[in-house]
Amino acid sequence: MIVSDTDFLSSFAKIDELKLVFRVFKTKEIVITESVHNELKEAPVFDLLLTYFSAKENKIIIKKVSAKDVPENLGTGERESITLAKDKRARLLMDDRDAGKYAEKVDVKVIDIPSFLFYCKEKKILNTSQLKTIISKLKSKDFYEFKSAVEKALVSDNWIPSYI
């Protein structure tokens, strides 16, 4: 199971790359919580997501969850997403640094946008040109900011995974 928080899903919807997320994780469903759904409803990108709620494949499913034992200083969407991912032992797509650090402390596998893109690069799902395009779209349409070293590594043809 793949659980997503608002930021990750919204970012890839804005650049019309949600299909890539489904493809990379070899899943037909991404699960979000009611709070994430409510946050997305307020976002300009919501209209782009509507088809995913009623699709037969590449579908976004909404689950009702009560956040439990998660710090109150995190947003409701983050809290519920962490709870759901922990309860279901699912991977969590989340780009909020503080929430991600907490989630990892409670043994939730968190995948942020740079990690996702590095995985796509390592597995040769995306080539350098495609990565440059996605990075450019994230920066221009989502105002996403990459650390300079991360961006250089993503678009470098000589990048070697750090665990080698």
Question: Model-predicted segments: where are they?
Answer:
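Short active-site oxyanion
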Residues: 7-8, 27-29, 86-91
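Acidic, PIN/NYN-like endoribonuclease modules and their adjacent C-terminal/linker elements
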Residues: 44, 100-164
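Short hydrophobic alpha-helical runs that function as membrane-insertion/retention elements
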Residues: 91-94, 112
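A generic structural signal for short hydrophobic patches within well-formed alpha-helices
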Residues: 9, 37, 99-100, 117
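Acidic, metal-associated active-site segment
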Residues: 76-91, 98-99, 119, 137
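Acidic catalytic patch
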Residues: 56-73, 97, 149-150
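PIN/NYN-family metal-dependent endoribonuclease catalytic core
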Residues: 3-4, 12-65
